[in-house]
Amino acid sequence: MKVRILGSGTSTGVPQIGCTCPVCTSADPKDNRLRASAIVETEDARILIDCGPDFRAQVLHLPFEKIDGVLITHEHYDHVGGLDDLRPFCRFGAVPIYAEEYVARALRLRMPYCFVDHRYPGVPDIPLAGN
């Protein structure tokens, strides 16, 4: 098993826009962190944990490979704001979303166009698994 940390920053990322603290103004690359996300890989599957608004930037440098599912820890924007960027990965097939029911309800409200019966072309195929 391999765990790849895609981001370990706060909900606003680091550096935070407008912040003048020593970390946010540091030139050290270790002080430049995208929002929290990870990919867990085994021989059989690749599971994304959280898909925040930095997702596109987090995966641009990685090999373009199938994502077998996404585990969403909670419904805050910094953990779900990048779900629409899963569109290219749907070329491999549906990318199921795994989440608690309260998170699934929030996703249906936030992104209803993804979870209706008749989606328009190009909408990511990200069914809510088990719901």
Predicted regions and their residues:
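Binuclear metal-dependent hydrolase catalytic cores
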Residues: M1-N131
